[in-house]
Amino acid sequence: MELTQPAEDLIQTQQTPASELGDPEDPGEEAADGSDTVVLSLFPCTPEPVNPEPDASVSSPQAGSSLKHSTTLTNRQRGNEVSALPATLDSLSIHQLAAQGELDQLKEHLRKGDNLVNKPDERGFTPLIWASAFGEIETVRFLLEWGADPHILAKERESALSLASTGGYTDIVGLLLERDVDINIYDWNGGTPLLYAVRGNHVKCVEALLARGADLTTEADSGYTPMDLAVALGYRKVQQVIENHILKLFQSNLVPADPE
């Protein structure tokens, strides 16, 4: 089955965040060129419809992503074994292959050179960052085993962990945390993985990050903490998770130390 859009459509472009609190970008609007986009914003706005954790069959960043991209479906999303003719796949870059989860072609590219696994694109995104952003867990697992560096930051300090958290890909978040990445890494927007997980209303991802020690006091450049965002956006389940975590921390501090 042939791709319905040119390969270039898979290349994402940076979107400038809203500069004023009262006028954030609306993730539901269409771009000027007519393609659907999602735009990062750590400013509270009208809550989006409550979504469950991302389905394993869907691999595109959720609202709150730091990326602007077309919503081209990959072969895995369509449920097809092949999404393009071999000649078309051969024309894709290593970053596009990682984003689409085209493992066979990705492996062929990596065999061509030792330095390709951490090769950045024009925005500093590595294949691992792309795969993490699109929820391609098998690709993420393969790249980590191949030697991909999960600590690399893109030009605007975007990280694989932050983008995986943005999409609510809890399993990928877990894989990255096993590699001792900075759980509180911040990007150009002052956003941390926890802030992006809250912004996307990803309950399980928030739970996983808190369980691993994510900092609840960190503020984005907008001035909002994770709890502030949850309250402002009306994300009650996320708010409850944060409150329960705070209660556990408080209770643990009240437990007297064991006598020697």
UniProtKB/Swiss-Prot annotation:
Residues 22-33 have a biased composition (Acidic residues). It comes from the Eukaryota. PROSITE patterns: ANK_REP_REGION (PS50297), ANK_REPEAT (PS50088). One of its GO terms (biological process) is positive regulation of MHC class II biosynthetic process. Ubiquitous. Keywords: Activator, ANK repeat, Cytoplasm, Disease variant, DNA-binding, Nucleus, Repeat, SCID, Transcription, Transcription regulation. InterPro entries: Ankyrin_rpt, Ankyrin_rpt-contain_sf, DNA-bd_RFXANK. Residues 1-79 are annotated as: Disordered. Residues 57-77 have a biased composition (Polar residues). ANK repeats lie at residues 89-118, 123-152, 156-185, 189-218, 222-251. Phosphorylated by RAF1. It is found in: Cytoplasm; Nucleus. Coiled coil: none annotated. Changing D121V: Loss of expression. One of its GO terms (molecular function) is DNA binding. GO terms for cellular component: cytosol; intercellular bridge; nucleoplasm; nucleus; RNA polymerase II transcription regulator complex. Forms homodimers. The RFX heterotetrameric complex consists of 2 molecules of RFX5 and one each of RFXAP and RFX-B/RFXANK; with each subunit representing a separate complementation group. Interacts (via ankyrin repeats) with RFX5 (via PxLPxI/L motif); the interaction is direct. RFX forms cooperative DNA binding complexes with X2BP and CBF/NF-Y. RFX associates with CIITA to form an active transcriptional complex. Interacts with RAF1. Interacts (via ankyrin repeats) with RFX7 (via PxLPxI/L motif). Interacts with RAF1 via its C-terminal ankyrin repeat domain. The same domain also mediates its homodimerization. The third ankyrin repeat is required for association with the two other RFX subunits; RFX5 and RFXAP. The three central ANK repeats mediate binding to the PxLPxI/L motif of RFX5. Activates transcription from class II MHC promoters. Activation requires the activity of the MHC class II transactivator/CIITA. May regulate other genes in the cell. RFX binds the X1 box of MHC-II promoters. May also potentiate the activation of RAF1. It is linked to MHC class II deficiency 2: An autosomal recessive disorder characterized by immunodeficiency and recurrent bacterial, viral, fungal and parasitic infections in early infancy. Additional manifestations include failure to thrive, chronic diarrhea, and autoimmune features and allergies that may be present in some patients. Death often occurs in infancy or early childhood. This is DNA-binding protein RFXANK.
